[in-house]
Amino acid sequence: MPLFFITAGYFFSLKYLNDEATFVKKRVKGLYWPFVKWSVFFLIIHNWMFDIGILNERFGNETGGVTHPYTWHQIQQNLWHIFTAMGGYDQFLCGAFWFFRGLFVASILYLIIYKVVLHVLPEKRANAAPYLICLIMLLLCAWKTYEGLKIITLVQGGYRDLMGCFFFGCGFIFRQYAGQYRQFIGRHYAALWTTILFAVIVLLFSKYLTANMNWRSTFVQFLSLPIPALLGFLMTYNISLWLDRHEGRLKQFLVYTGNNTLNIFIFHIVAYKVVSLLKIWYYGLDIRQIGCHMVIHEYSQQDLFWILYTIAGVGLPLGCTWLSRKIKERVRGYKASSGSRPQ
């Protein structure tokens, strides 16, 4: 997830410091509205998922937590929560929806703090603003995780939002040096050996100091997050530069994937259920294990079903997106041809 925050910051423009309304409108249109629309959709079908067996009260997440059908009161409360706090979404079908809120809060928070810092700093020190913001966010997250504090006005306490703001700022800073970085990795095979080095470091962190943007992250997990997150971004950036120089089907696929990331993000958990059915058949498991979140945990450390989960999580949403657009084109073409016929 840090990769998405860093990338969003990479494309942040200082022009929005004097055009806040446009920036906020874009955030509402691109983050708040999709969150509300799809959270309400999954809220409506939540209880139906129990009727058809996709969800159940026997199997759930890896720690044993399960979900339950909603009462009428819970449905109403979740609806209010969705609109007013960007919470209340279905944890088992929309588990990654926290990202909508995280990026929404992080990006607007970054804009606000940037304006405040510019007001406080002397004009000749204005270039230090992005670094100061990242430092402030790191210190706040350190304080928060060390003392177990919560921002009570933010769902899940605000850790993801603050760390998201830090990574957003890192992306903006990197943009200022992107040209110099590309020159550096363009010499003496630096792109190759730095990519390998970054990959090894990320792998070591994932094995010995596992960390992510879990909202309950400890102080140690907080300390072990920035390095692999930033190096993972640089590794991905190196690879993307290489891919961008080579035309072909792979590049076309990745461009199409990037243009339809939202659909993948919304439906990847639902797509996993197809692979879960296959795994249930293969191992002869209880059919109710399809309710496991996000994937079936049994044998997950031994088998290679993660490959199929990855393919399905990306491929099925993309395939459905492509098919739906083709159908819409056919329908529009049919209506246009019907309308042009003489009566």
Question: What does each of the following model-derived ranges do?
Answer:
Residues 1-343:
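Alpha-helical transmembrane segments and their immediate juxtamembrane cytosolic regions
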